[in-house]
Each structure stands twice: as structure tokens, then as C-alpha cells.
Amino acid sequence: IHNAKQCVEFIQKQNERIAANDATVESEIAERRFAVLYLYERPYKKAEDEEELWLSEMAQAAADVLGISADHIVKKERKPQKGANQYEKKYTKNIIKGNVQEQNQIFRIDLSTYLDTGLFFDHRPLRAKIRENAGKKRVLNLFCYTGSFSVYAAEGGASYVESVDLSNTYLSWAKDNLRLNGFSDAEKYVFTKADVIEWLEKKSAHIQEDKKFDLIILDPPTFSNSKSTENILDINRDWPVLVENCVKMLNPNGTLYFSTNSTKLSFDESKLPKNTECTDETQNSIPKDFEGTKCHRLWKIRLY
């Protein structure tokens, strides 16, 4: 499957086979089903092999419940980020890549190479909202990662979509995702390699009126210490400046969606620029399968 149209056709045929009680469908689906299991480091002393043993047992339990083989469970470990240290550990040596379909869009994912897979499922509602509201609008996707918001904006009929990220790897991935969904116009769908903090500061100071945006997505990492830039991002500290510069880039009645997965960020509306109104959209943006978690917070900031 190489594009969204083929994906839709495949799913339609699969559903027809299910409706016809084709006995081979379930086994085929199981062959394509994978799960990622994360172990978050526990804050107490333990035997050296305790975590690996526990993770293996949980992986087998997950495989039994999902009806898949144990080698389809990708095991990973997360440790808290401390200062400039960012730690990850992966237990699989297999290369597991492919495409997934979400709300009629198709995305390339990689379950094995990186700690994250390329698509954050907790933001499905916001992606759908972007698609609903992007029609004929200029859209800016900051810290774009693999470009999922950009795909939804393009599908929603945006007149222009710019995706900004410092990583060549993720920008290339984002381009692939746009192409998978049929969006390849280089003038309409622009990819910018830049340090977002620096780019925003310079761009917002001199932006022409006809280059401003109607919709901006600001979904930064909590912390970033890239070798490609001297800037160190700490969203708990830097969010007011980022939001202020985003607002400078908005057209009147334009909207900024600011999201963070930091539980320590202290959001204060008094630090927002003048002539803005803000609503906390967190509860409306968390899907049912993430209820009860602190997966992210989301604010809608409108310039009037």
C-alpha cells in the first residue's frame, strides 16, 4: 500500500471479507498487528535483570490478550529526562516499519528504530479539528516532527502549509507522509529546516502582512538539547516567548493551538499577549482511550 487511496480500497475489501465470514481474515489481521510496550523506570533499587524480566512477562501477557505472537510486541524503556541527558533503551533488534491508517489519513511509522513511532495517538482529536478548520487557510506547523498535523491541514483544504523542524530525518519523514496522502505541490506544502526558537524570533519581527498565518500549531517537546543548535529548549521556561512570537505571526482572528505534555509547566494567562483570548481545550482534546492520563494539555489562543 503506497498511498491513501490504496489504503481505503484495501480496508473496504477487508471489511467485505469480514462480512462474508472469510475465515482467513483474522489471521491476516493478526500478522499485521503490532504493539509497543513501554517500561517507565521505577524510582527504587532493583536487581539488574528485574526490569527485563518484568517487561518480558508483560509483553507475553499483552500478546495473549491481543491475539498476536510475542515477537510482535516491541519493548522499550523510558527514563526521566535529566538536564541535557535524554535516555532511551530498545529491546528489539528487528526492523519493524510500515504504514497505518488514521481517520482516513495514512502515515509511515517505525516501531523499532526510535523511542517514539512517528505518530502520537493522543492528538487524534486535535488533528481532526485542524482538518475541519483548515479550509483556505495558511497553516504553520512548528516542531512538526513527522508532519501529521500538516497532513490533516492539507486534507482540510489549506491554501498553504509550512512545516518547521530542526531535524532532517523528521522533515524527510513529514514529506513522505504528505506524499502518501497525495500532497506534493512544493509551493503549497513547504518544509523548513530551522531551530524553531530562532526562526520564530527572526520571522515574527519582520513578517509581511500577507505572509501571516490563520492557524498555527505549537506542539514542542518538553526539553530539547540538539547538537545542531546552541539553543536549549525548556518549555517550562520558554513557553511565554514562543507563544508571544507565534501570536505576532497570526492574522486577525487567527488561532494558535499550544500543546504540551509537560506536567510541570505553569500556564499563566496573564503572560499572554494583549488582544488575545484563551480557552483550555484539554478535556475536549483527549480521546477516550487516553482518559485518566496526563498525556497532554492544550490551549486555544485567538488573536482578535
Segment roles from a protein language model:
Residues 52-120, 128:
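Non-catalytic substrate-recognition/targeting regions of SAM-dependent transferases
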Residues 136-142:
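Conserved class I S-adenosyl-L-methionine
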Residues 146-158:
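Conserved SAM-binding loop of SAM-dependent methyltransferases across substrates and taxa
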Residues 160-165:
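Conserved SAM-binding motif I beta-strand of class I
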Residues 169-211:
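S-adenosyl-L-methionine
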Residues 170, 193, 214-244:
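Mobile active-site "lid"/loop adjacent to the S-adenosyl-L-methionine
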Residues 241, 255-304:
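C-terminal catalytic and target-recognition region of SAM-dependent MTase-like enzymes
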Residues 250-251:
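Helix-to-beta-strand junctions that scaffold the AdoMet/dcAdoMet cofactor pocket
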